[in-house]
A protein has these predicted regions:
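A short helix->loop->beta-strand "cap" motif at the edges of active sites that frequently abuts
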Residues: 28, 122-125
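Residue-level preference for the first positions of well-ordered beta-strands
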Residues: 1-4, 92-93, 126-128
C-alpha cells in the first residue's frame, strides 16, 4: 500500500504520525524518516524517537531557504535515502515525511523516489510519502 499526503498548509506530518500510531497498534514494525526537519525541530520528534528508537531519523537541515544551501540539503537527503533503503528491508511500513517537498525542491530526484516505490511494491511494504 502506498499512501500520499501532499498539499499546502498543515496536517501532512500529523497524518503520517497518525498512520505510524495506527500501524504500531496493529503490531507492525514502522520506520519514520524526515527529509527536511532537523532533529529537535518539531514536537512529534520526541515521541517518535521514544517509540521507534533507531527507526526514527530527522535527517534534514531545515527547510530550503536559499539556492546556495541546496548542495548541503542534497547531501543530507541522500543520507536519509540510504537509511530509508535499509529500513525498508526491516519494517512493515516506512514513512518518509517531507519526501515530496524534497522532490519538488529538486533535493531528491524523481528516479530516486520511483526506486523506493518499486522496492516497496516488490517487498509488499507499506510506504507513506
Amino acid at each position: 500500500m502506498i499512501l500520499v499526503y501532499t498539499g499546502d498548509g498543515k496536517g501532512k506530518t500529523s497524518a503520517c504520525t497518525g498512520q505510524t500510531v495506527r500501524a504500531m497498534g496493529q503490531g507492525m514494525k514502522v520506520a519514520f524518516g524526515q527529509f527536511m526537519k532537523r532533529d529537535g525541530q518539531a514536537g512529534e520528534q520526541t515521541m517518535l524517537a521514544q517509540w521507534l528508537g533507531p527507526r526514527f531519523l530527522a535527517g534534514g537541515l531545515g527547510f530550503l531557504r536559499r539556492d546556495e544551501e541546496r548542495p548541503a540539503h542534497r547531501e543530507a537527503a541522500l543520507r536519509v535515502l540510504d537509511w530509508a533503503r535499509e529500513q525498508l528491508l526491516e519494517v512493515d511500513m516506512l514513512v518518509l515525511d517531507e519526501s515530496l517537498y524534497a522532490l519538488g525542491a529538486g533535493i531528491l530526484l524523481r528516479g530516486e523516489v520511483e526506486d523506493l516505490l518499486a522496492r516497496a511494491r516488490q517487498q509488499d511494504k507499506h510506504l507513506v510519502l
